Amino acid sequence: MTTLTITRPDDWHIHLRDGAQLKDTVRDISRYMGRAIVMPNLVPPAIDTETALAYYDRIKAQVPAGSQFEPLMVLYLTDKTSPEEIRKAKASGKIVAAKLYPAGATTNSDSGVTDLKNIYPALEAMQEVGMLFLVHGEVTDSSIDIFDRERVFIENILSKIVADFPKLKIVLEHITTKDAVDFVTQASDNVAATITAHHLLYNRNHMLAGGIRPHFYCLPILKRNTHQQALLGAAASGNKKFFLGTDSAPHAKDRKEAACGCAGSYTAHAAIELYAEAFESVNALDKLEAFASFNGPDFYNLPRNSDTITLVKKSWDVPVSYPLGDNNVVPIRAGEQIDWQVE
């Protein structure tokens, strides 16, 4: 039987939600992830240090006994985020980054930034204190085609931020295009990117050909297969700028299977298992450990995990749904099989 032992991985981008859903999302992510960057787009969002730290406490209260899982918190940037708030967040020791959501770009982003110039003072402070800048890299102009919004963001916005703040560490999150791969590859060592398992395994044909499959609908949206291949190439290249970020984003079944369904795919039930499939598909299992366990903490200037997990090449049946608070969530690969499992 094929086995693969790797240093315990981390998830550098996840949505854990809040309230009754928290016990279920934390249960899934804490099975074998050491740490996770927890997104702050709650209702209301975590726009200040106190709110983010209270959320940290709620997450920790749900970590199962015996798990060493540690949430890493993120501040939600708004037009009014002050340099003082950035310094306060950094001094907390629990908040490691601040997140740009262009207003209206994704789930619960209505409180986001309307004009980048409004956050330049905050970015200056982040550059000074060494706080990372996480970016949802899509424009929100309705005249821009949804499949082009990442590319246009990089060309018109991100390139300027990188030039204006050369010492600011920036993570372009959940990249979906060859354009993003090329930009990150060519940028300075202060620019990195996360890649999801579902963007490595799927493209827009999986979502749209032969019927609409709403559980593949996420933002940024799945792109054509040429972009998928570029992502696989980047992830499997060994380039230290690319690392694991699931963007696992649960929504109740009835909110996905609807006339106007929510964006987000749930992969926390089998994150590293799905990444193993993706890396195996390009004969690069030997590159999985760096992508999943080394590149992220190295970029964040955090220690790598010291223990290991073991993956076994053994198929298992994915349930059609998992509990999610008072509802259920339909995961990626629901009712089908995954080729790998964690021992």
Swiss-Prot record:
Cofactor requirements of the protein: Zn(2+)
GO MF terms, alphabetically ordered: dihydroorotase activity; zinc ion binding
Residue numbers of N6-carboxylysine PTMs: 99
Keyword Manganese carried by entry: no
Keyword entries, A-Z: Hydrolase, Metal-binding, Pyrimidine biosynthesis, Zinc
Entry's Gene Ontology BP terms: 'de novo' pyrimidine nucleobase biosynthetic process; 'de novo' UMP biosynthetic process
A Pfam family this chain is assigned to: Amidohydro_1
GO-annotated cellular components: cytosol
Binding of Zn(2+) 1, residues: 13, 15, 99, 247
Pathway annotation: Pyrimidine metabolism; UMP biosynthesis via de novo pathway; (S)-dihydroorotate from bicarbonate: step 3/3
Database matches in SUPFAM superfamilies: Metallo-dependent hydrolases
UniProt KW Transcription regulation keyword: no
Function, in words: Catalyzes the reversible cyclization of carbamoyl aspartate to dihydroorotate.
Family assignment from sequence similarity: Belongs to the metallo-dependent hydrolases superfamily. DHOase family. Class II DHOase subfamily.
Subunit structure, as described in the record: Homodimer.
Name by which UniProt lists this protein: Dihydroorotase
UniProt gene name: pyrC
